[in-house]
């Protein structure tokens, strides 16, 4: 009987304690809420402004050189008025603002997003142009990797192909020429490295790439002279003579031709083109820089 009475007396005590544990925090929270009832919660909520107002504020900031503020305004249009005409315009202008700031990765990302959503709009070639410019601005000298030059080339070629009448085509072609020149310069840099170490086969491969793939760049003259030098060192005199002949035909006043001619003359040889050589065939495509 004693144990039974004890067991019965603990249950009500536990119920009272549980009730108190629920009531006390509630009273505390109510007190806190009543003491802070004047807090302005509106500052935690986006202040929605008309899309055209935000967009024009973005343009004004952009024209004034306040690029961070411009980006914020264009982003606000996209966030507060998604899928509206103003949001579409803000997306491409936001990409341009990022480009102006030098935030090239962000500019590329925004412009690519624009093209994915609006590939057929009037601003689509402009978005493509921004992507190309963002890659172009990151091109490094020829001693370093030329990934950005390849990306510039591809992006600008796509622009010229897809929008041939666009106002951006002329500048895109200039960027294409520059990117090609960079890529040719990289091949020459590697080719010279191999030539200095008398690794002639590897050197020829690089110089051949320049002649065949970058025939309209300023590096073709030197590439033909280096081919003359490499083939001559390998004992392939017919190829050496052909390289010199093609060089002389296209660049008769070139110092590189004079050096190649002198090299052949040192062994009683002269430039003579072999029509069956790959060099002769590639030479017909040379247009000069």
From Swiss-Prot:
GO terms for cellular component: Bam protein complex. It comes from the Bacteria. A lipid is attached at residue 32 (S-diacylglycerol cysteine). It holds the Pfam family YfiO. It is found in: Cell outer membrane. It is a lipid-anchor. Residues 1-31 form the signal peptide. PROSITE patterns: PROKAR_LIPOPROTEIN, TPR_REGION. GO terms for biological process: Gram-negative-bacterium-type cell outer membrane assembly; protein insertion into membrane. Keywords: Cell outer membrane, Lipoprotein, Membrane, Palmitate, Repeat, Signal, TPR repeat. CDD domains: BamD. Its main location: membrane. The keyword Protein biosynthesis does not apply. A lipid is attached at residue 32 (N-palmitoyl cysteine). TPR repeats lie at residues 51-84, 87-121, 184-217. Belongs to the BamD family. Part of the outer membrane protein assembly complex, which is involved in assembly and insertion of beta-barrel proteins into the outer membrane. Part of the Bam complex. This is Outer membrane protein assembly factor BamD. It comes from Mesorhizobium japonicum (strain LMG 29417 / CECT 9101 / MAFF 303099) (Mesorhizobium loti (strain MAFF 303099)). The gene is bamD.
